[in-house]
Amino acid sequence: FFDRSEKKNQLRLLQGDARQIIPALQESWDLVFIDADKISYIDYYNMLVPRMAAGSFLLADNVLFHGEVLQDELKGKNAKAIAAFNAHVQADDRTQNVLLTVRDGLMLIRKK
């Protein structure tokens, strides 16, 4: 699909462990979309937010994790990780957020 895009010169596909790739990048971003291993969401967030300009956005997918994060007792490592991520973002004074309850949950996070 990159080859079909009129922006193909601006696109670059990076594959591998994002916890190793992100620190090696020199760019800053206006929009970031996270849909990756749930256990590492907090790591990604902590690496990305400092490199984002004020007013930029981070979108985190699957933040309801099949509704499991709404249960009284969290089961499974992914549900626990997403619940921890949601609490982590909510407590971060650097950002504002809203959780959209579409499909499996999408959190829209804006850096102040």
Label for each model-derived stretch:
Residues 1-112:
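S-adenosylmethionine/decaboxylated-SAM
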